[in-house]
Amino acid sequence: FQMKILDLTVPAKQAFISTAGPAAVVKALNKLNRPEVEHTFDRLSPMYIERKHMKEGLRRLWKTYELDRCKIDCPSWSAAKIFGMKFPGEKSGGFGIRVPTSLDIGDEQSKAKQFMTTANYLVGIIETMRAILRVELDPVVRLTKLRAVLREVTAVVTKMAFKPELRQNEKDREKVRIFFLVPLLHYIVSKVLCEPVHDYMMNRKGFRVGNRWLGGGARKYAAAMGAWDEDRTFGCGDVGGKDTKFKASDISVLLASILRCYRMDGSDEAFITQVWMEWLVDNTAYHIVNWPGGFRFVVGLLFSGDYNTSFLNTMHVLWAIHSYGAWCHDVHGIDPVTTLRDGVPVLSVWVQGDDVTMSSCDDRFDIHSLNGYLKKWDLELKEDSVVKTKQFFADVDLVSGMIRTPPDQCIVFLKRVIYTDGHVVRPFRDIRDIGYRLYYTTTGVPDHAQYCAKLAGLMLDTMGTNEPGWRFCRAMIGNIIKQKRATLEGMVSAMEGDYFVKTRMYKQGLQDASAEAIWDLTNDKSMLLERVDGYYVTPEEEYLQKQSYDDRPMMGSKY
């Protein structure tokens, strides 16, 4: 991996040196043949994909310089084309991305030279990381040094932009988001790390999973990939109202290569993957949404709203499936690689940005065991589809409040925070860290009754299928009511006003029940409001328990 950017091809180098400008470089780079990666197990490791497609990611970044008419240090992802709007201060719309000061070589220099400086800086970072891996043998020292290197490229908010949702839904019509925009260097990092896997999941050589939200639309893409051909179906999704089928084997090889990292404790791939996960966590920030009646906080990435969001979200979903593999391996003694291979289908996945559809492909795992980890409180569990798979649909949204459970039920979905235990990466987020902040009244204050209603609906949905999640929901409601932040009556009133929770109440026969009756029916005498034995409590959680809600640190701190 001793790669220099200028050694792409002889024509590319000549074009760069010539006076023709960036257009000639783009033309030369466009002639590069896209490398074809064979669908073999070893050749799809994350590090192999990164090495193979570094040129491709940089080539696409080159192309953006020519397409966008922005300032020298503000390459854009054609936001005017994507969103049909212009941002304040931009000539033709687009995101204002500034190169970090240490990389800024002056406005008088050419776009090409500025880009090459940034790209070479990135290659230097990667080379430094690999040198650490070669020299340091102690795993803790390795990880410490890798984290120190990667900290140099921590994203900094340099600019914000506002964008209306442009939806027809009455509730969301006036919603406006604030987007956090990041330096060019972080675009390159995210493209190099995330785009190859994302691309393979979406539109490459049989990895027919997910849809491109740019360029053609879901129906066109589904038709192009043969989604409705009966002889090539396994698993099921939904595109344009039609059942869309795909092979579970299409994604199995890719997932298997990622799952390998779980058991590659001394490898370069495992350590770089761990550090990369921490980098994602370091760039997790609060997303501010301006609703008609006021503001509310949503947990999101600094990349929220730009072209790379889809890449990063896809990777988070992949890591959810990685956790599923760990669950298979540690708890049930099943090799997750074998589990996902042809002939032993267990789980098929459809990923599009932050939306995911999963199908249980046989009877080995109970589909209900996944309840309580998804944003939609009412899981739409359908009957056997035309391809004989039971499926459920779930929207993994940035506003979800996640339930943390013991490691033996570790299905971790989008926007879970990661922390390290020694050199082991583990998932962590206490729902109290963010949960009640997600539901605001029109006056801009937390609506604890609505939050309790969501928890109650989730508790009803998971009763008997996810005991740790059920206990935690009940404990949360009990604590909020004890603190007199909400009442049972207020919770039930909010439940009646929430479509999904109300649907769940009707299914439980609670539509006319009083608040006390609902509480009694959902209560098991063995389930106390206090902490119960067997619930996995981390030091971070113990720290958070000792603080009041208002004093608890916001996300983005080390907790």
Give the predicted meaning of each segment.
Residues 1-559:
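Viral RNA-dependent RNA polymerase
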